[in-house]
UniProtKB/Swiss-Prot annotation:
The gene coding this protein: Taf7
Organism superkingdom: Eukaryota
GO molecular function terms noted in the UniProt entry: RNA polymerase II general transcription initiation factor activity
Organism: Drosophila melanogaster
Example of a GO cellular component annotation carried by this entry: transcription factor TFIID complex
The organism's taxonomic lineage, starting at the top: Eukaryota, Metazoa, Ecdysozoa, Arthropoda, Hexapoda
Official protein name in the record: Transcription initiation factor TFIID subunit 7
Length: 479
């Protein structure tokens, strides 16, 4: 085992040391050859470097606690050169350290942190000498030979990659414990990308662009694009059938809302009749049916003033959502609700008074639909809920026959222009179909092929729509 002598050791004051049990040595990275001379002349001759620059590497030597004081005393006394020797293996990872007569087995590992070291001559000016990124750990027990041998001995190693057993997990300060695991994430592995296939697809797309008759492109900045601008694909043509469907759905929504409200009243009245025996005895008998007779206890009290009326807000929100579904532009619905405005106004006044008459809760159902939509009990809807005028209006509305609005009248010249325009559009769409079909036949990528097929199906749909419109205008022209 070759011996590397330490010709000069410079002690560092305790304020620059991380721990009093660690000593920093300046180990010169130069090969020194010592030859035995005669007893009169014994001096070391070293081989000079070609560039004349002596570089040095620094590391921290960590020794056991009982020997740390001995090393500090030797450094302060200036006898460290005679009392301490360091011997390292050729791989510069394992070695031995002799302190007086005691031998320690060492291992040089890499720190996860970098510590800067400074030198001074006059204790006033400091200059940086090196970056300390290794630590020499000294132990009394020899390390197992199995740990020295790498398990992946036969594998090809990267010369720039350090073996994991030489990577120290901790720093030199307590906050840096397990810093390598906590601070540094694992290196992401590069995914294998099939470059030839991608290059082939790109060349194919470029070849299609070169063979195209015309290529149009437009640069659109999404930030500068106004919000009210709509794409042509999002604008649907006006159709009278859609309007009729909307009117029908609005009518069903209004009927459903009325039926749900009546069913809720049925449930409340039934529960109140079951709990009639629990009413307080001091209530006046001639007051009629009050709010608490139907809804039980009071809706709110002074104890709940701190909290908002969540139930009322929720109910109002539901009513607003249901009412928002109704179309305000529908003349038939406005006529229906306008005629019954007086009756509903009277109903609101009654609700505000919070007093109900017992005649409202009869046993005969005023409407078969409402009785069917109510609760499963024998209690029917109140007889005075709908008056005769309201029922007459409702029957008139249900029996009303909806007449389609008249289509706009076109002159013969306008019809001919529409026919020419639709014929030109159909011709252009069919030309695009032929071009897209040719492109799809030559595409091998499944995802791109599916996307192109969707575009082709859209073109087929547009052609069918234009042909139907063309047939309508041709019929108008013949008539």
């Amino acid at each position: 085992m070759p011996s590397l002598a330490v010709p000069h050791l410079t002690p560092i004051s305790n304020e620059h040391l991380v721990s009093s049990k660690e000593v920093v040595f300046f180990w010169k990275n130069r090969i020194e050859m010592f030859e035995k001379k005669s007893d009169k002349v014994k001096q070391a001759e070293h081989k000079a470097r070609d560039d004349g620059v002596e570089l040095e590497s620094q590391f921290i030597m960590r020794v056991p606690k009982e020997l740390a004081d001995t090393v500090h005393e030797a450094i302060n006394a200036g006898t460290i050169k005679d009392r301490l020797t360091i011997q390292l293996d050729p791989d510069l990872r394992y070695g031995e350290v002799r302190i007086d007569d005691q031998i320690l087995y060492t291992k040089l590992v890499d720190l996860p942190t970098v510590v800067e070291s400074y030198k001074t001559i006059d204790n006033k000016s400091f200059y940086k000498s090196a970056d300390i990124c290794q630590i020499l750990i000294c132990k009394e027990e020899r390390e197992d030979e199995t740990e020295k041998e790498s398990p992946n001995k036969n594998k090809k190693k990267d010369p720039n990659k350090v073996d994991k057993k030489y990577l120290f997990p901790h720093g030199i300060t307590p906050p840096c414990k397990n810093v390598r695991k906590r601070r540094f994430r694992k290196t992401l592995k590069k995914k294998n990308v099939e470059a030839p296939e991608i290059e082939k697809e790109v060349k194919h797309l470029l070849r299609i662009d070169n063979e195209a008759v015309r290529v149009d492109y437009e640069i659109i900045n999404e930030e500068d694009k106004p919000m009210d601008e709509l794409e042509q694909s999002d604008i649907k043509p006006y159709n009278d059938a859609d309007d009729d469907l909307q009117d029908e759905s609005t009518m069903h929504a209004s009927e459903k809302t009325i039926m749900e409200m009546s069913s809720q009243r049925h449930l409340q009245v039934e529960s109140d009749d079951d709990e009639a025996s629990n009413f307080p005895s001091h209530r006046a008998p001639n007051m009629g049916v009050a709010v608490h007779d139907i809804f039980g206890e009071e809706v709110s009290s002074t104890d709940d003033e701190d909290e908002p009326d969540r139930g009322n807000n929720t109910m109002q929100r539901r009513v607003m959502e249901e009412s928002s579904r109704l179309s305000a532009d529908d003349s038939r619905m406005s006529d229906f609700f306008g005629a019954s405005g007086s009756n509903t106004g009277a109903g609101v006044v009654k609700m505000e008074q919070n007093v109900f008459s017992k005649s409202m809760f009869g046993h005969e159902a005023s409407s078969p639909k409402l009785s069917a939509a109510g609760s499963s009990s024998n209690l029917a809807a109140p007889s005075g809920f709908y008056d005769s005028q309201m029922l007459a209006k409702r029957e008139e509305f249900e029996n009303m026959e909806f007449i389609d609005e008249p289509q706009p009248q076109y002159t013969q010249q306008q019809v001919q222009q529409k026919i020419n325009q639709l014929t030109r559009q159909i011709r252009e769409l069919k030309a695009q179909q032929v071009q897209k079909s040719t492109e799809i036949a030559s595409i091998q990528n499944a995802t791109l092929k599916q996307r192109m097929q969707e575009t082709l199906d859209n073109l087929y749909t547009q052609v069918i729509e234009r042909e139907l419109e063309l047939k309508d205008f041709e019929n108008m022209l013949e008539s």
